[in-house]
């Protein structure tokens, strides 16, 4: 399964909320943690940093993780599904800066997915 080869970013606006997505090369959980810390610092105004990763452990086994960071609509799982569908290893993260309008679980999930697809489509593989 191919890794994400280079950092690829994409952002969208949905009803004044900003969604900043990145497909990030990461081979280990330690790299995932470091990259997440960078994203949280870069987008410090974001209320949510949802992410999913597929990396290898020390024995070469595939490890999958996803986090919603308190966001509704299970965006972490939507991001993990995108990594699975594209058969990619690495980190997919989306940071949301709330714009004052609630999108509801369906709208939030769609917005996270659209932002992440944009990052993948900009050839981060």
Annotate each PLM feature.
Residues 1-74:
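C-terminal regulatory domains involved in ligand/effector binding and gene-expression control
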Residues 30-37, 81, 110, 114:
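Solvent-exposed alpha-helical segments within well-ordered globular domains of core cellular machineries
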Residues 42, 82, 86, 118-123:
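Conserved, well-folded catalytic cores of nucleic-acid-processing
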Residues 45, 55-57, 74, 81, ...:
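Generic structural "secondary-structure junction" signal
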Residues 64-101:
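Conserved interaction-surface patches within small, structured recognition/assembly domains
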Residues 94, 101-125:
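Glycine- and Gly-Pro-enriched alpha-helical subdomains that act as flexible
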């Amino acid at each position: 399964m191919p890794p994400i080869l280079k950092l690829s970013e994409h952002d969208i606006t949905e009803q004044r909320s900003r969604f900043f997505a990145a497909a990030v090369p990461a081979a280990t959980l330690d790299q995932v943690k470091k990259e997440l810390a960078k994203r949280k610092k870069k987008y410090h105004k974001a209320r949510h940093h949802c992410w999913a990763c597929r990396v290898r452990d020390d024995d070469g086994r595939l490890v999958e993780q996803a986090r919603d960071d308190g966001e509704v609509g299970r965006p972490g799982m939507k991001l993990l599904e995108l990594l699975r569908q594209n058969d990619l290893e690495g980190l997919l993260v989306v940071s949301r800066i709330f714009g004052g309008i609630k999108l509801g679980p369906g709208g939030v999930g769609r917005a996270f997915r659209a932002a992440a697809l944009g990052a993948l489509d900009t050839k981060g593989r």
